[in-house]
C-alpha cells in the first residue's frame, strides 16, 4: 500500500499481477503500480515499511526449538539457514527490489500491528475497536486495541503458544485442506 499524507492512495497484492497465489517474491509489480497511481518515484518516498520484525520472530523460533530440543533438531537445522538468509538480508533484498533508488531507513512494524493497520486505516470509520487473530506473528497470536484518526494503539496481546489461529490451522489440516491457503 502507498500512503500520501496519511491517506491510502494505492494498494495491490503481487499475486494479482503475477497470477501466483501467495507470491512470496519481491512485490515489484505492486510497487510500480502503487507509484504510478500516486504519480511519484521511489526516490520520493519518505518511508518504506515491512510487515514484521524478523529478529523478534527469530527469538521466538529459537526459543521454541530450544525448549523442545532435541526433538526438533532436524527441522531446525533444515529451516534456519533458509529463514536466516531471507530475513538477515532483507534490507539488501528491499534495496535490490527497489532498484537501489530508496536511500532512507526501513521501518519494521510488528506483524499484528500490520494486520490491524491494514484493517483499520482503509475502513470508513474514524474510530473503531481493533482485533487481530492469526497463527502467530513475532510472539503475538492475537491483539486488541483501537484506532482513532491516524492513530492506532494495540493495548493487549495473546502470545505464542496460545493461539486460536493455530488451532484453526490444525482443524484445516485435519479436514484435508492446505494450511495458510485452504482456510479461505
Q: What are the functions of these language-model segments?
A:
Residues 1-184:
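Short acidic/glycine-rich loops and adjacent helix/strand connectors
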Amino acid at each position: 500500500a502507498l500512503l500520501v499524507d496519511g491517506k491510502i492512495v494505492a494498494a495491490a497484492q503481487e499475486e494479482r499481477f503475477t497470477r501466483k497465489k501467495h507470491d512470496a517474491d519481491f512485490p515489484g509489480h505492486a510497487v510500480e503500480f502503487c507509484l504510478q497511481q500516486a504519480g511519484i518515484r521511489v526516490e520520493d518516498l519518505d518511508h518504506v515499511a515491512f510487515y514484521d520484525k524478523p529478529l523478534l520472530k527469530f527469538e521466538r523460533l529459537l526459543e521454541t526449538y530450544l525448549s523442545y530440543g532435541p526433538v526438533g533438531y532436524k527441522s531446525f537445522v533444515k529451516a534456519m539457514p533458509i529463514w536466516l538468509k531471507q530475513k538477515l538480508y532483507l534490507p539488501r533484498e528491499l534495496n535490490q527490489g527497489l532498484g537501489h533508488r530508496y536511500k532512507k531507513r526501513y521501518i519494521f512494524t510488528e506483524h499484528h500491528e500490520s494486520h490491524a493497520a491494514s484493517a483499520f486505516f482503509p475502513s470508513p470509520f474514524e474510530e473503531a475497536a481493533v482485533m487481530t487473530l492469526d497463527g502467530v506473528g513475532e510472539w503475538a497470536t492475537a491483539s486488541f486495541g483501537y484506532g482513532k484518526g491516524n492513530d492506532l494503539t494495540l493495548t493487549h496481546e495473546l502470545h505464542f503458544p496460545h493461539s486460536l489461529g493455530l488451532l484453526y490451522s490444525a482443524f484445516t489440516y485435519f479436514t484435508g485442506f492446505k494450511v495458510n491457503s485452504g482456510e479461505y
